[in-house]
Curated annotation (Swiss-Prot):
Keyword rRNA-binding tagged: yes
Recorded family membership: Belongs to the bacterial ribosomal protein bL21 family.
Keyword terms: Ribonucleoprotein, Ribosomal protein, RNA-binding, rRNA-binding
Any Gene Ontology biological process: translation
Protein name: Large ribosomal subunit protein bL21
Species, as recorded: Pseudomonas savastanoi pv. phaseolicola (strain 1448A / Race 6)
Length: 103
């Protein structure tokens, strides 16, 4: 069984037992989180597509950890002017483990 969920403005295909890094959620480690914006639920050849969401479908996950991704380096420069600006950014994430899909 698998599902497609929406969180943090992104779509993820998930299945029970999978680990996933999503945009940061303000939930403590060890707690469970429920996603109710489920776009699609599939089980073998039986696929249920929502319009826009599947009614009554939820995905339950457990928060494993919070952290930050690797640094993304950004360089801006102006040609022929001896001007260069180096910047970096580390995005926060929440790692979750999918524990169940109810459809």
């Amino acid at each position: 069984m698998y599902a497609v969920i929406v969180t943090g403005g992104k779509q993820y295909k998930v299945a029970p037992g999978e680990y996933l890094k999503i945009e940061k959620l303000e939930i403590a480690t060890g707690e469970s989180v429920t996603f109710d914006r489920v776009l699609l639920v599939g089980n073998g050849d039986d696929v249920n597509i929502g319009a826009p969401v599947v009614a009554g479908a939820t995905v339950v996950a457990e928060v494993v950890s919070q952290g930050r991704h690797d640094k993304v380096r950004i360089i801006k420069f102006r040609r022929r002017k001896h001007h260069m600006k180096r910047m970096g950014h580390r995005q926060w994430y929440t790692e979750i483990k999918i524990t169940g899909i109810q459809a």
